[in-house]
């Protein structure tokens, strides 16, 4: 009997502690958040709409999933109304996403506004085009295309028509300014090198020529063109130094005398 | 037990089949001007592209664009605005081009062309192409001012410039002819 009362008391105490914990209010309000997320996800596709997607330019993008930067990328979206009510295709939004995390937007493109009414049992083709920027060259990105449309009752639907990782390649087919200027720079460098080497070589040859001349030089007296020198100046010179030979020669001549 | 396993396998296989089932022919139709400028009394090239993105061929495909180019404002130079193709196989495409000539200048709304096709000889489909939208048809004179070769302008320019260039050259020739001997002496 005593043991049973102890157990009962213990159980009561445990319950009280547990209740106190609950009353503390440490449990966060997770439930409403989840329901909100669910609300966001409820905008989906309509069962009466059939959509198709096709790249027109570049034509092999449907298979190889590659674009080139700086070249137009064009695609078509087909919308088929299989139901009994009109649909209005409002717009299509295109965006580049991070390839490993598609919730991270790298670039949002201008959305294509269509506002095309599609009667029951009819189809409509819509087109859109964009350029991939050079900064995306050589890396994969996630291309996501969503089509937003309404039915006659005003219900909004969103269809994802393309959601793939694509490779963006650098366009190296045409003339690129970078390589062009590199080429011009190299040409200029080689011309400069030629000029410098020519200069150096001519300097070398001139030096050797000078040394030779120094050895051979014997004065210019024999080659003087006297027509250019005034008469009196020539006479004065003759008076002052009649001998045109070098001082060494003169000395030797005196000795001989 | 074995039976239930088989049943499960069947369910799985049928689910996969739903995912990869063949789609009927689905034609995407594309209308696009190839000329950069639309000019009155000059050729304007339009291209229509049909892409069958379904898994089955599309039968008896027609393009009808007669309503978007009324003959009182457009001449059809080459090509047909109503074309018929017997079949477009799955995954292939067809392009068709037309040369037209606008008769008047001003804004013009390029609307959608209508494409019809059959899947399985029974289901008739009507598709509208994309709309290139509103475009401006240039006046001929405006276009010439920007792009035509300007021969008359050059001729007038040379006539205006003639007194100062040709006139001075003639004067120089006259004065040169007046002194033939002096020039000879100098050269010798």
Curated annotation (Swiss-Prot), chain B:
<protein>
    <recommendedName>
        <fullName>Translocon-associated protein subunit beta</fullName>
    </recommendedName>
</protein>
<feature type="topological domain" description="Cytoplasmic">
    <location>
        <begin position="173"/>
        <end position="188"/>
    </location>
</feature>
<feature type="glycosylation site" description="N-linked (GlcNAc...) asparagine">
    <location>
        <position position="109"/>
    </location>
</feature>
<comment type="subunit">
    <text>Heterotetramer of TRAP-alpha, TRAP-beta, TRAP-delta and TRAP-gamma.</text>
</comment>
<feature type="topological domain" description="Lumenal">
    <location>
        <begin position="16"/>
        <end position="151"/>
    </location>
</feature>
<keyword id="KW-0256">Endoplasmic reticulum</keyword>
<feature type="transmembrane region" description="Helical">
    <location>
        <begin position="152"/>
        <end position="172"/>
    </location>
</feature>
<feature type="signal peptide">
    <location>
        <begin position="1"/>
        <end position="15"/>
    </location>
</feature>
<dbReference type="GO" id="GO:0005789">
    <property type="term" value="C:endoplasmic reticulum membrane"/>
</dbReference>
<keyword id="KW-0812">Transmembrane</keyword>
<keyword id="KW-0325">Glycoprotein</keyword>
<comment type="similarity">
    <text>Belongs to the TRAP-beta family.</text>
</comment>
<dbReference type="InterPro" id="IPR008856">
    <property type="entry name" value="TRAP_beta"/>
</dbReference>
<keyword id="KW-0732">Signal</keyword>
<feature type="glycosylation site" description="N-linked (GlcNAc...) asparagine">
    <location>
        <position position="93"/>
    </location>
</feature>
<comment type="function">
    <text>TRAP proteins are part of a complex whose function is to bind calcium to the ER membrane and thereby regulate the retention of ER resident proteins.</text>
</comment>
<keyword id="KW-1133">Transmembrane helix</keyword>
<dbReference type="Pfam" id="PF05753">
    <property type="entry name" value="TRAP_beta"/>
</dbReference>
<keyword id="KW-0472">Membrane</keyword>
